[in-house]
Regions:
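Flavin-dependent oxidoreductase catalytic cores
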Residues: 1-102
Length: 102
């Protein structure tokens, strides 16, 4: 199975993934105050350490009125440092990270 094309690197535009496995978005409910948390960071680092090529942070609202659930991520300038922390930590594990906007 390890000889499968699934485990070979792949490029998406300028991004090269270490393999073709991608953790799809599934609502984590790990964003108290609608901001990234240590729990969210640890979760995605664990997924990355497990070997996926890319993990996806789920269901981020782009406006406050777009929030559907408690503990849902809300995209705004003040959360950028927290997202940067997650991104850096996931990259350190060798994976890429994406985000689902909704």
């Amino acid at each position: 199975m390890m000889n499968s094309k699934l485990f070979t690197s792949a490029s998406i535009g300028p991004l090269t993934l270490r393999n073709r496995t991608i953790r799809s978005a599934a609502f984590e409910s790990m964003c108290p105050g609608n901001a990234p948390s240590r729990q969210l960071k640890d979760y995605h680092c664990s997924v990355a350490a497990g070997g996926v090529g890319m993990t996806t942070i789920a269901y981020a609202a782009v406006t406050q009125s777009g929030l559907s659930f408690d503990r849902q991520l809300w995209m705004r300038p003040e959360i950028i440092p927290g997202l940067r922390e997650i991104t850096d930590a996931v990259h350190k594990e060798g994976a890429a990270v994406s985000i689902q906007l909704g």
